[in-house]
A protein has these predicted regions:
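Pyridoxal 5′-phosphate
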Residues: 1-179
Length: 181
């Protein structure tokens, strides 16, 4: 079988699966427990966190684990909105977002945030000229998906980030996954 629906679910890399199984077998304890098995599980999580932090060039304390992408998107968007609410309530996104993003933005809109959707060009990418027009001093967030799950279009994330440099309170949320970091 040739599996092509990677946007819905991606088969786990064999090395990752082997490592997961090895850790599950050797560290079955609850990392929050004070017994030996819990301490071993905590040490394994701490080691993995250190490795991820090094790969991303961040501090381990900046790594937050969630149950999945939907929870992560929800958490990130709401956290940014609440963090920057004193600087503005304007958010820009695209009509192509996953429901975990669009649904969270709808909830924020119901709480008084203003949501604008940037136009998409015929090739499926963000219209950077329209994005530039939508940006305002009170824009606190631009949310885009790196690769559209239906069209497969890669968004110009680097160019979008460059547009935000003049907006110090505007964060860029990119829904994406990292492979082989």
């Amino acid at each position: 079988m040739i599996y092509l629906d990677y946007s819905a679910n991606t088969p786990v890399d064999e090395a990752v699966l082997e490592r997961f199984c090895a850790v599950e077998r050797s560290c079955p304890g609850n990392a929050n427990s004070r017994h030996q098995a819990g301490a071993a599980a905590k040490a394994a999580i701490d080691e993995a966190t250190q490795s991820i932090a090094r790969s991303l060039n961040v501090q381990p304390a900046e790594i937050i684990y969630t149950s999945g992408a939907s929870e992560a998107n929800n958490f990130a968007l709401k956290s940014i909105a609440r963090l920057e609410r004193h600087h503005g309530k304007h958010i820009i996104s695209t009509p192509l977002e996953h429901s975990s993003v669009s649904g969270t933005l709808t909830a924020l809109q119901e709480q008084g945030y203003e949501i604008d959707l940037v136009d998409i060009k015929q090739d499926g990418t963000v219209d950077l000229a329209h994005l530039r027009e939508l940006l305002r001093p009170d824009t606190i967030l631009v949310a885009v998906t790196a690769v559209d799950s239906e069209l497969g279009m890669v968004q110009p994330v680097t160019e979008i980030a460059a547009l935000l440099k003049d907006y110090p309170h505007c964060h860029l949320h990119v829904d994406l996954s990292l492979i082989h970091i």
